[in-house]
Amino acid sequence: MIDKLDKKECCGCNVCGDACPKGAITFFEDNEGFLYPSINKEFCIKCNICEKVCPVINIDALKRNDFEHPHCFAAIHRNLQVRFDSTSGGAFSAFAKKAYSEKAYVGGAIWNKDWSVSEYISNNKDDIEKLRSSKYIQSNAIGFYASVKKILQDGEKVLLCGTPCQIAALKSYLKKDYENLITLDFICMYVNSPKVWHKYIEFLEEKYSSKVIYLSLIHI
C-alpha cells in the first residue's frame, strides 16, 4: 500500500487517489498545508495499485525517453504582452494556442478564488489566461488524472503542462502511451507550503486593507 512510502519522499501528486478502485485513499493537510494520502483500511483490498502508479516508487521504470541524446532549444514568445503575463518566456502560451487551434484540450494549474491552486483542463481557448504563468504552490490534482484519461479515451487531443512528478504520475496512471497526448514539464526544485502562502496573502490584505485581486510571481 502507498503508506509504505515515507512522508518525506511523497511528491504530493495525488495520483494514488485516482488509481484506487475502491476510493479508499483520501488526502489530508499536514501542519504546513501539504496534501498527503491516507488509507481507509476498511475499504482497502490490498491490490497495491496505488504503489504501482506512484512515480516515486517507480522512478526507475519512468526514467525513459526515445532520444539517444537530449535535444535542447531556447525559446521566447514574440509577443511582449504574453511574456509579461507569463513567468518564464511564454512558451506554454504558444503551445497552448496551437493546441486550441486543433480543438485540443489543454490542462495545467490554475488559481482558485481563495488563491489556492488546482489542476484544470478544458478546450476553451479563453482559459489560456488562467493556465499561463507558474504558480509555485502545491496543486490539488485529486480527480484530475481520471478526467484526462477519459478525455484521451474519447479520442480527443490533449496538451498537458505540469511538474515532472505530475507528468510521471499521469504516464504511470495511463499505463500506455497515447498518440493524442502531448506533455510539457519543466525543471522543478520544490513547491512552497500552501499554508505559508495563505498566511502571506492574509498579511498583504491586512497590510494594505484590501483584497488581493491579481497575482504575478515573476519577481518572487
Residue map of PLM features:
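Small-residue-rich anion-binding loops in enzyme active sites
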Residues: M1-K8, A109-K113
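Iron-sulfur cluster-binding cysteine motifs and their immediate structural context
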Residues: I2-D3, E9, V15-E32, Y36-S38, ...
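Short, charged amphipathic alpha-helical surface segments
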Residues: E42-F43
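Iron-sulfur-associated redox domains of electron-transfer enzymes in respiratory
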Residues: N58-I218
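Conserved SAM-binding loop
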Residues: G12, K46, L159-L160
